[in-house]
């Protein structure tokens, strides 16, 4: 198992530090480290602190902040940037861009779970500039070009 450095910036997280909920969990819950309830109106986007910072320190890794499925499906609360990408050399506090795409005001309470953090492998590549590609079956076929499911 990889180990990464985590800096707890909000002491309330020391009681319940980020952890995998089950052995099969891919993501760790990120919490809203706010002092008072925060009302997010329809169409509003706001940055919410998570009370923690990470330093992956390995260019072969990156972190991704993803939405929690229940918040999006039940309340229309998703990430304002859709996915947050955290580079291996970033060391600042993790912030979550919360967007209310729903039709009703939503209240975030202190320490509510607002997003998930996953760690993913990264492959940096070099580019070989070419004039043409070798032919493939798909070619330039794009959106919907492979037929119906």
Curated annotation (Swiss-Prot):
Name of the gene: dut
Protein name: Deoxyuridine 5'-triphosphate nucleotidohydrolase
Top-level class of the enzyme under EC nomenclature: hydrolase
Similarity section: Belongs to the dUTPase family.
HAMAP family documented for this protein: dUTPase_bact
Keywords, in A-Z order: Hydrolase, Magnesium, Metal-binding, Nucleotide metabolism
Annotated positions binding substrate: 68-70, 81, 85-87, 95
Catalysed reactions, semicolon-separated: dUTP + H2O = dUMP + diphosphate + H(+)
InterPro entries for this protein: dUTPase, dUTPase-like, dUTPase-like_sf, dUTPase_trimeric
GO function terms (MF aspect): dUTP diphosphatase activity; magnesium ion binding
Native organism: Dechloromonas aromatica (strain RCB)
């Amino acid at each position: 198992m990889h180990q990464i450095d985590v800096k707890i910036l909000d002491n309330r997280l020391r009681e319940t530090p980020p952890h995998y909920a089950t052995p099969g969990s891919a993501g760790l819950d990120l919490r809203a480290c706010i002092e008072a309830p925060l009302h997010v109106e329809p169409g509003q986007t706001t940055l919410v602190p998570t009370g923690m910072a990470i330093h992956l320190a390995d260019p072969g890794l990156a972190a991704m902040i993803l939405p929690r499925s229940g918040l999006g499906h039940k309340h229309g609360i998703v990430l304002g940037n859709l996915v947050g990408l955290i580079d291996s050399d970033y060391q600042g506090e993790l912030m979550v861009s919360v967007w209310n795409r729903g039709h009703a005001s939503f209240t975030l309470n202190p320490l509510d779970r607002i997003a998930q953090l996953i760690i993913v492998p990264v492959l940096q590549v070099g580019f070989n500039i070419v004039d043409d590609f070798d032919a493939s079956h798909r070619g330039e076929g794009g959106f919907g070009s492979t037929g119906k499911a």
